[in-house]
Structures are given as structure tokens and as C-alpha cells.
Amino acid sequence: MPRTKKVGSAGRFGPRYGLKIRRRVAAVEEKMRQKHTCPVCGRKAVRRISTGIWQCQKCGATFAGGAYLPATPAGRIAKRGISSP
């Protein structure tokens, strides 16, 4: 996979789409590839399996989340509304 110093993994797009968009894509992909906190066991071991599917490598919990992050802003608001009486 081609990479460049300025845009990392978005270097695969070459000179297309402009630098600003490629930097934004690189930032989103970098966040996506990080390990995230598991909502079940609390460990930082959640990886993306496919679009919207996340799995904890420690406890094996599989759950649906956002396409690029396990918890979306709308999901956090909904969870807050459900948990409070």
C-alpha cells in the first residue's frame, strides 16, 4: 500500500482529490486503526472487523458501532438517554 510522509495511508490516492481531503482521510483511518476501549471488559483491545463491526481481542465481545469508530456521537447521546431515569 503506497504511503507518503504528508498523508500516510491516503498516499494511495496519489495526486487526486487534493491535499486537504487526503489529510482528512488519513486522520480518520489513523483513528480507526487504533485500539479502542471495550465496553464489556474495559480493556483497550477493540479492533474493527469490518464496516461497523467491532471485536474485543481480549474478551471476544463483538458489537456494532460506527463505521470508523466504535462509538458514534449519536450513539453516546442515545446511551445517555437510556441509562438515565
Swiss-Prot record:
Span of zinc fingers (C4-type): 38-59
Keyword Lipoprotein on entry: no
Example GO molecular function: large ribosomal subunit rRNA binding
Swiss-Prot/TrEMBL keywords: Metal-binding, Ribonucleoprotein, Ribosomal protein, RNA-binding, Zinc, Zinc-finger
Lineage: superkingdom: Archaea
Coiled coil: none
Signal peptide, first to last residue: none
Cofactor list: Zn(2+)
SUPFAM superfamilies in the cross-refs: Zn-binding ribosomal proteins
Cofactor note: Binds 1 zinc ion per subunit.
GO cellular component, as recorded: ribonucleoprotein complex; ribosome
Alphabetized InterPro entries for the sequence: Ribosomal_eL37/eL43, Ribosomal_eL43, Ribosomal_protein_eL43, Ribosomal_zn-bd
Single biological process term from Gene Ontology: translation
Keyword ATP-binding in annotation: no
Family: Belongs to the eukaryotic ribosomal protein eL43 family.
NCBIfam families: eL43_euk_arch (TIGR00280), PRK03976.1 (NF003058)
Name of the protein this chain belongs to: Large ribosomal subunit protein eL43
Source taxonomy: Archaea, Methanobacteriati, Methanobacteriota, Thermococci, Thermococcales
